[in-house]
């Protein structure tokens, strides 16, 4: 594990290490386009800057409901860089399941994909967001331009359009929670499994 001095670390350091040592190497391919480690790191920095400037703070839990698209990776590492906890969950969940996870985890915010006509992800998330007691901010990765934004519901570009390409990653300890993965809940309510930065 690549860590900061003094025993402090952050899982996002793995991305930063790759961006520093192999900046032009491919981090991922999407729709025939290569995205380098340096590009992923810059986008994660922009999102981390956007999160903190929106009032999200170290230790806050940020839910992420998104399919396998580049924005998932950018947001995932941006959340970690900001010292927040990533809370990824399945795009097929219905609003009552999403609401349970948001409130059970005490998520402060959620980033979600708008979806498709067949799978309108953001519509389900919006219903849960409006009923949630803990979640106060929602950002939508637009895909169809059909989704109506509203009070505390913004376009993802608000986060990703930060002018700053740099970010001082928040240092965490090995005991700090980095990710919470929820079980499927097949035998009862889903349970959150916490993973640390270690």
Regions found by a protein language model. Give the residues of each.
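Conserved AMP-binding/adenylate-forming core of the ANL superfamily
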Residues: 3-11, 24-69, 73-77, 94-99, ...
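Conserved pre-ATP/AMP-binding loop-to-beta segment of ANL
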Residues: 24-26, 139-140, 161-182, 189, ...
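ANL superfamily adenylate-forming
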Residues: 32, 116-174
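Short acidic/polar active-site loop segments enriched in Thr and Asp
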Residues: 57, 108, 136
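Conserved S/T- and glycine-rich ATP-binding loop of Class I adenylate-forming
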Residues: 62, 79, 110, 177, ...
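Short hydrophobic alpha-helices that are characteristic scaffold elements of the AMP-binding
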Residues: 77-82, 103-104
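Conserved ATP-dependent adenylate/AMP-binding module captured primarily in the ANL superfamily
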Residues: 87, 93-127
């Amino acid at each position: 594990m690549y860590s900061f001095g003094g025993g402090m670390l952050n899982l996002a350091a793995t991305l930063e290490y790759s961006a520093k040592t192999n900046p032009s190497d491919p981090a991922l391919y999407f729709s025939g386009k290569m995205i380098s480690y340096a590009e992923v790191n810059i986008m994660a920095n922009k999102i981390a800057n956007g999160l903190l400037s929106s009032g999200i703070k170290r230790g806050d839990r940020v839910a992420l409901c998104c399919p396998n698209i580049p924005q998932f990776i950018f947001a995932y590492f941006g959340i970690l860089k900001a010292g927040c906890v990533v809370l990824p969950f399945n795009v097929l969940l219905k609003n009552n399941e999403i609401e349970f996870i948001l409130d059970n985890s005490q998520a402060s915010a959620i980033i979600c994909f708008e979806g498709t006509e067949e799978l309108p992800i953001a519509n389900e998330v919006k219903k849960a967001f409006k009923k949630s007691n803990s979640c106060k901010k929602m950002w939508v990765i637009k895909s169809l331009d059909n989704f109506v934004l509203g009070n505390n519901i913004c376009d993802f570009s608000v986060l990703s359009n930060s002018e700053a390409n740099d970010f001082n990653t928040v240092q965490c300890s090995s005991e700090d929670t980095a990710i919470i993965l929820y079980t499927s809940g097949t035998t009862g309510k889903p349970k959150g499994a916490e993973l640390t930065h270690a």
